[in-house]
Amino acid sequence: MKRLIFTDLDGTFLNHHNYSFEESFEALQKIKAAGVPLIFTTSKTKAEVEYLQEKVGISEPFIVENGAALFIPEGYQGFDLSFLEKYDDKRIMVFGKSYAKVLEFYRRYKERCSMAGLSDMSDEEIVHLTGLNQRDVIHAKQRDFTEPFILKDKTKLEALKKSAHTYELKITKGGRFYHIMSKFQDKGIAVIKTIELFEDLYHERVSSIALGDSENDIAMLEHVDIPIVIKKYDGSYLETNVPHIQKSSYQGSKGWNEMVLKYV
């Protein structure tokens, strides 16, 4: 049976503090040798993921900005993907709203709801908040679908969620930021659509694995055959009611390596 591996990045494939993936080397080599699609499923942007893929040495499909879109390299595994819309050198399936729509809401509510969005932050502020280097900050600001933000007053969260709903938007929580996005998107929907697409392309059922550590990974974990939670940097685990969930013994990329080696 063909397999797909979906993975969150920050705190899962990448270590929380230094963004390293060095401890995942053994599992990565086995994935590459087996030809299993390793699908980064992340809140990061297209530019961020493409740069990371270069460093990792892969060219695979990926899901960006919390399930907003699936990108597939042109001619991936020899498939005819001409039925999908073209986007630069990729094919794309879009599930989210445009960044312009999201920013319209953010700008209307940012002051009354005490939000500080990525689009309003200086590069220096983002470096301080995230630990990213200058190049990665530039990639992070190249957004197409969602707006990450810091909520200065947590008592405003419920009112903000209600307001977002009237715009067909929603608020989710990631590892460092809250995110404004289409209410019709999440990692789970993107994973479902990706599995369906690959089953059509392969003409057979696929087995799916997902690894994550944050609240915005729950929808992804709910829709795969093997859901795996990676231990957080503080030693805790994401709380979820997903059946048959597995937990890593280690944090970050070491925990990712540990769990992937069980199945590849």
Where is each model-derived feature located?
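Conserved acidic, metal-coordinating active-site core of Asp-based
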Residues: 105, 109-209
